[in-house]
Curated annotation (Swiss-Prot):
<dbReference type="InterPro" id="IPR029063">
    <property type="entry name" value="SAM-dependent_MTases_sf"/>
</dbReference>
<keyword id="KW-0808">Transferase</keyword>
<feature type="binding site">
    <location>
        <position position="166"/>
    </location>
    <ligand>
        <name>S-adenosyl-L-methionine</name>
    </ligand>
</feature>
<dbReference type="InterPro" id="IPR004498">
    <property type="entry name" value="Ribosomal_PrmA_MeTrfase"/>
</dbReference>
<keyword id="KW-0949">S-adenosyl-L-methionine</keyword>
<comment type="similarity">
    <text>Belongs to the methyltransferase superfamily. PrmA family.</text>
</comment>
<dbReference type="InterPro" id="IPR050078">
    <property type="entry name" value="Ribosomal_L11_MeTrfase_PrmA"/>
</dbReference>
<feature type="binding site">
    <location>
        <position position="230"/>
    </location>
    <ligand>
        <name>S-adenosyl-L-methionine</name>
    </ligand>
</feature>
<protein>
    <recommendedName>
        <fullName>Ribosomal protein L11 methyltransferase</fullName>
        <ecNumber>2.1.1.-</ecNumber>
    </recommendedName>
</protein>
<keyword id="KW-0963">Cytoplasm</keyword>
<feature type="binding site">
    <location>
        <position position="188"/>
    </location>
    <ligand>
        <name>S-adenosyl-L-methionine</name>
    </ligand>
</feature>
<keyword id="KW-0489">Methyltransferase</keyword>
<dbReference type="GO" id="GO:0016279">
    <property type="term" value="F:protein-lysine N-methyltransferase activity"/>
</dbReference>
<comment type="function">
    <text>Methylates ribosomal protein L11.</text>
</comment>
<feature type="binding site">
    <location>
        <position position="145"/>
    </location>
    <ligand>
        <name>S-adenosyl-L-methionine</name>
    </ligand>
</feature>
<dbReference type="Pfam" id="PF06325">
    <property type="entry name" value="PrmA"/>
</dbReference>
<dbReference type="GO" id="GO:0032259">
    <property type="term" value="P:methylation"/>
</dbReference>
Length: 293
């Protein structure tokens, strides 16, 4: 069936309140969309992260009288009289199929592919990780995840132990295992990430080789041949005393989730204990790698 879409602009401070009003007015769904294609990262547990300039979009049945809806919304404190909005008629589509059509297998480095489950793998002889796009955790589309996957693909991981610090979907740990690592350890602050990583590892047949910890429960004596942390610049700096202890002597460290403009600040937190490589960049993002001294 066709739909009517009501779109209006908001800030991160009032977007949720506006969304609540759209639901109260009869919207069958409400979504939040970045107005300016600004990167945003996975929220902390219990936190909703929105863009500073956010479009709030309400979807209504095609038979809805939108003049009545607008009049109702004008009487709310968060919007008021004459609020700016746009109303559009949406044609009937198979929205799930259209969403699925946007995702294709992606290649990282020489051997590694990340493939949605509904697509055929391009190369059955390659290293294929089956991972479906989700709302919360990484699937390889972000430049920082891509940089980390390419780095892992270029390492000799045979028989190695890998720690994925801030594992999210588990994509990096799972990729490392598929690339030959003997064991992987995933650490995250979010229980949902732990569950997502466990589910994705089972889907890829590597669950027995993946150990998962909430950050508050991780053992004190963890160490690995390779450590990768794709989080944010602030946490990478703050957690440097912890992350720096994880690679064994001669082990590899890979850090991302960092804007190129933040690279020097992050590198300074690690340069005493690691021999750092030249920074790799993709779009405005970067990856910092090095070897434990």
């Amino acid at each position: 069936m066709p739909w009517i879409q009501l779109r209006l602009n908001a800030t991160s401070e009032n977007a949720e309140a506006i969304g609540d009003e759209l639901v109260e007015s009869g919207a069958v769904s409400v979504t939040f969309q970045d107005s300016h294609d600004t990167p945003i990262f996975e929220p902390l547990p219990g936190e909703t992260r929105l863009w500073g300039d956010t479009d709030v979009i309400g979807l209504y049945d095609a038979e809805t009288d939108m003049s009545i809806i607008v009049a109702m919304l004008e009487n709310t404190a968060v919007l008021g009289k004459g609020f700016v909005h746009k109303i559009e008629q949406l044609e009937d589509k198979d929205w799930e199929r259209e969403w699925m059509d946007n995702f294709h297998p992606m290649r990282f480095g020489e051997r590694l592919w990340i493939c949605p489950s509904w697509r055929e793998v391009p190369d059955p002889n390659a290293v294929n990780v089956m991972l479906d796009p989700g709302l919360a955790f990484g699937t390889g589309t972000h430049p920082t995840t891509s940089l980390c996957l390419q780095w892992l693909d270029g390492l000799d991981l045979a028989g190695k132990t890998v720690i994925d610090f801030g594992c999210g979907s588990g994509i990096l740990a799972i990729a490392a295992l598929k690339l030959g690592a003997a064991k992987a350890i995933g650490i995250d602050i979010d229980p949902q990430a732990i569950q997502a990583s466990r589910d994705n590892a089972q889907r890829n047949g590597v669950a027995d080789a993946l150990t998962l910890y909430l950050a508050k429960d991780q053992p004190d004596n963890l160490s690995a041949d390779v450590v990768v942390a794709n989080i944010l610049a602030g946490p990478l700096r703050e957690l440097a005393p912890i992350i720096s202890t994880l690679p064994r002597q001669g082990g590899h460290l890979g850090l991302s989730g960092v804007l190129a403009t933040q690279a020097d600040g992050v590198a300074q937190a690690y340069q005493e204990q690691f021999t750092l490589d030249p920074v790799a960049e993709k779009e405005e993002w970067c990856r910092i790698t090095g070897v434990k001294k």
